[in-house]
Amino acid sequence: MPTISSRGSSGAGPKHDAVDGAPMTTHRFEVVHRAGDAAALHEFEPPATPTPTVVVAEATGAALVLGSTQPASDADPERARLGGYEIVRRRSGGGSVWLAPGGQVWVDIWIPAGDPLWHDDVAKAAAPIGEAWRQALVDLDLGVGLWVHEGGVEARPWSTLVCFAGVGPGEVLDADGRKWVGISQRRTREWIRLQTMVHRVWDPVAATDGLGVVPDEWLSQAVGMIGDADPVPGLIASL
C-alpha cells in the first residue's frame, strides 16, 4: 500500500524536480515561475541571493497535501491510489490543502532578513501580504467586503482537517466569512517563506476524498473562488 512521506507520493508515478521559468524583476521583487509536482514545489529552496522574490507555482499533478501537524492517519492512501492523486506533506500549516492543475493560484513570497516586510511576529509579517492580496482581489471586483484577519489562528468547523476551513494570520475573508486567501509561513534566520493561495475552483468533494469524509453544506460554501481572473500582477504591484 502506498505510504505518505514529506517528498513521496501515493505511488502514482515518478517524481520530478520543479522546473523554473526565466526570472524577471517587477518593482523590487524578482518573479520566478515554477512548475512541478506538489512535493517538489513544497521543498524549502530559498533564492540564491537575499532578494525579495515572488514564486508563482504551478502544480503539474493533483495532490492532497497534509499540514505539518496533521496526523498521517487522516489520509487514506488507497483512495488516493484509486483517484490517481498524490498524498504529500508540507512543513507548514495545519489542515490539508487540495491541489489540482489549473485549480488554484499558488504564490510563494520570500522575504529576506532585514527587508522592510520582515517582522519577527508571525501575524505582523503576514498582515501586509494579506493586504496586498486583498487589494489585488478588490481591483478585479472579486469578493464582497474583503478583509484581512490580523489575529491568530482561529478554529472553525472542519479546520483540523481542511486548511481553507480555518482562519490564520493575514488571511483574506469576505463579509460572509468565506476564505479567499490562505497563508502559511516557514522561517529561518535568513528567510520568511509565505505560502499563499487562492482557488480558481473550490471542489469540496475532491478536497475531502483522500480524507475519507463527505463535505457538508458549510464546507461547500466556505471558500471563495476567482475563476479565470489573474490576480498575480496586482498582487506584485501591491507588495
Model-predicted segments: where are they?
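Short histidine-centered catalytic/ligand-binding loop motif
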Residues: 109-126, 219-229
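A glycine-rich, hydrophobic loop/mini-helix early in the fold
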Residues: 77-121
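Long, positively charged amphipathic alpha-helical accessory segments at protein N-termini or as interdomain linkers
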Residues: 130-158, 186-239
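Active-site loop/lid in soluble adenylation, ligation, and acyl-transfer enzymes
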Residues: 2, 19-82, 86-90, 96, ...
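Residue-identity detector for glycine
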Residues: 8-13, 21
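Cationic, low-complexity basic patches in intrinsically disordered or flexible, solvent-exposed regions
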Residues: 16
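Aromatic/basic-lined ligand-recognition segments
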Residues: 162-173, 177-185
